[in-house]
């Protein structure tokens, strides 16, 4: 009689364990879903290049310009590339060119800043502007700041401007 009661209890306990173990397996198999998601990344994300706008990557190069005249013909292109190797070496190059012909009143305003931490840093800016004959009154204000911690620092700025005959009044301010 005791064996019979013990056997029934053992059988009931074993059956309960099997049932409890099967519930998660059933839930897993019923609730299993496959999530396949695809994302497309727009070209140029990570580094943003906009003419007359902002190039931003690990370090920040910012330029802002405003040109207003009676008639304006302009084209510009720019490229920005940066390579980081390890934690101590940073190599950055920024090149851009713009060509425009303008007649009338022109106002150019630009500001840029470059801040880096690395072994070598270099900043180069080239500006070219040609203007058609006429009366030109231009105000150009440029402010730049360059702060770096590293071993070598080089900054080069080239500005070229050619104009056809005419009357021109220009004020240029440069602060570093």
From Swiss-Prot:
- Location relative to the cell: Cell membrane
Segments of skewed composition (Polar residues):
126-142, 158-176
Q: Hey, what's the signal peptide range on this chain?
A: 1-29
Give the principal location in a single coarse category. Answer: membrane
Q: Where are the sequence repeats?
A: 123-135, 155-167, 168-176
User: Which residue ranges are recorded for the region named Disordered?
Assistant: 33-176
Ranges for region 2.5 X 13 AA repeats: 123-176
The UniProt entry lists membrane topology as: Lipid-anchor
Lipid attachment (S-diacylglycerol cysteine) is at: 30
* Low complexity bias spans: 35-121, 143-153
All disulfide bonds of the chain are: none
Physiological role? Responsible for the antigenic diversity for host adaptation.
- What protein does this entry describe? Variant surface antigen A
Whichever gene encodes this chain, its name is vlpA
